[in-house]
Amino acid sequence: MAGRKGGRAKRRKVCYFTANGITHIDYKDVDLLKKFISERGKILPRRVTGTSAKYQRKLTVAIKRARQMALLPYVADE
């Protein structure tokens, strides 16, 4: 098996919330929450977004609350 050849150097992902100084994630801020949801409506994992564990937990709670209040869909339309 050959190793990886060429390609780009891996860039470290930075947490969006710590970089922008956001301490509170509001479930009513739908535009912000949509950045962390896939086109199918699923919550994107930390390894994709680069969000820290602390803010990933807060983000998950906010997305679930927004879904409960019908601000975000549970599944995306096809």
From Swiss-Prot:
InterPro entries according to UniProt: Ribosomal_bS18, Ribosomal_bS18_CS, Ribosomal_bS18_sf
Family: Belongs to the bacterial ribosomal protein bS18 family.
Superkingdom of origin: Bacteria
Assembly and interaction partners: Part of the 30S ribosomal subunit. Forms a tight heterodimer with protein bS6.
GO cellular component: cytosolic small ribosomal subunit
GO function term, MF aspect, one: structural constituent of ribosome
GO biological process: translation
Transmembrane residue ranges: none
Keywords: Ribonucleoprotein, Ribosomal protein, RNA-binding, rRNA-binding
The protein, known as: Small ribosomal subunit protein bS18
Taxonomic lineage from the root: Bacteria, Bacillati, Bacillota, Bacilli, Bacillales
Function: Binds as a heterodimer with protein bS6 to the central domain of the 16S rRNA, where it helps stabilize the platform of the 30S subunit.
Organism: Geobacillus sp. (strain WCH70)
Pfam families in the cross-refs: Ribosomal_S18
